[in-house]
Amino acid sequence: MWLAVSLVVALSVSGSSAVCPCTEERLCQPVQNEHEFEVFVFDVGGKAWKFYDWSIVTTVAAFGKYDAELLCYAHSKGARLVLKGDVPLLDIVDAAKRKAWIMENVNLAKRQFMDGINIDIEQAVEESSPEYHALTALVKETTEMFHREIPGSQVSFDVAWSPKCIDKRCYDYKAIADSCDLVFVMSYDEQSQIWGDCIAMANAPLNQTLTAYDQYMGMKIDSKKLVMGVPWYGYDYLCLNLSQEGICTIPEVPFRGAPCSDASGKQIPYSTIMKQINSSASGRLWDKIQQAPYYNYKDDKGTIHQVWYDDPESISLKAAYVGQQKLRGIGMWNGNLLDYTDDPVVQQQSAEMWNALIQKQHTASITVS
């Protein structure tokens, strides 16, 4: 079923010889077609990709070790495979160093027959600082270089769930979005800075999430540049106290100036959540205000925990907004976090998560209040 990887074709890349790892030379050519709707998957390594829903996947960002078999298979399905791009901003304030970083990644993409780069820089930046201007220039120059050297390539940039200097990431979001092919909005970790009560809350509350897209579009960023990122993981919080109303008070862990944050909790994959929820004290609960599921359980020491996560119901509500607002697409962090074993129950659970990405885009109406 899976394409065999064999060294069969030699191609010239950047003046040196790179050997095509696929059984057919055409599978080493950059993907040229533009997808009207993007389903953007982050992959962190291993072979989970063999179980992705390739009927909808359009781009895979390879955040794990390079996998030639994944490259060949993605290309056989018309999907792009793109590099991860990360660099300390202090290293690219200098224009010459910036150009060297870009060329290094262009040449790497060529050697590996890849289709572009996802720039994932989540560092704190002060507005109008040298780093602020360097980051904007980096995205513009990277896009220009990739487009010139690898026709059809895609350059994307990951942004925080809101443009309001989240975690002190004060970027020139409008200029960045204008200069690259798309921006992946990381609509998760929305409790990274808690300024109010230090309590467990949803990873991506619906109204807060959608309001942030209105803010991005209010900056005159084209909706067709925005890909909504949803979480395939949740947060497990230890409760210092669980009130009668179900409010879980959590330990204070400061982050970038805020007195409390989701760093108080532990990230857990959806696959683990599905195993744990049936034996939990509460079973699945639903918060009508945040439009998100959660549950409570006791650990081996008798300590109460509260877990907030996203599931097909909460993701479908967000996917509906994607269609209503005609965003560029939807994606997730990350594709590896589902259970892809052969148990029929978990297979159904995983299929429902994939289906939630697209099933209600054009039928449901979401209003931000």
Where do the protein language model's features map onto the residues?
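A cross-domain feature marking catalytic cores of carbohydrate-active enzymes
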Residues: D43-G45, G64, L83-V87, I121-Q123, ...
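Conserved, mostly hydrophobic/aromatic
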Residues: V60, I119, V183, M228, ...
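Glycan-binding loop/region signatures in secreted carbohydrate-active enzymes
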Residues: P21-F37, V41-F42, V230-Y321, D343-S369
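Glycan-recognition patch characteristic of GH18 chitinases/ENGases
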Residues: S17-K110, H133, E141, M201, ...
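Alpha-helical scaffolding within the catalytic cores
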Residues: V44-A48, K65-L70, A100-N105, K164-Y173, ...
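Active-site and adjacent substrate-binding regions of carbohydrate-active enzymes
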Residues: D120-E144, P151-W161, Q306-V368
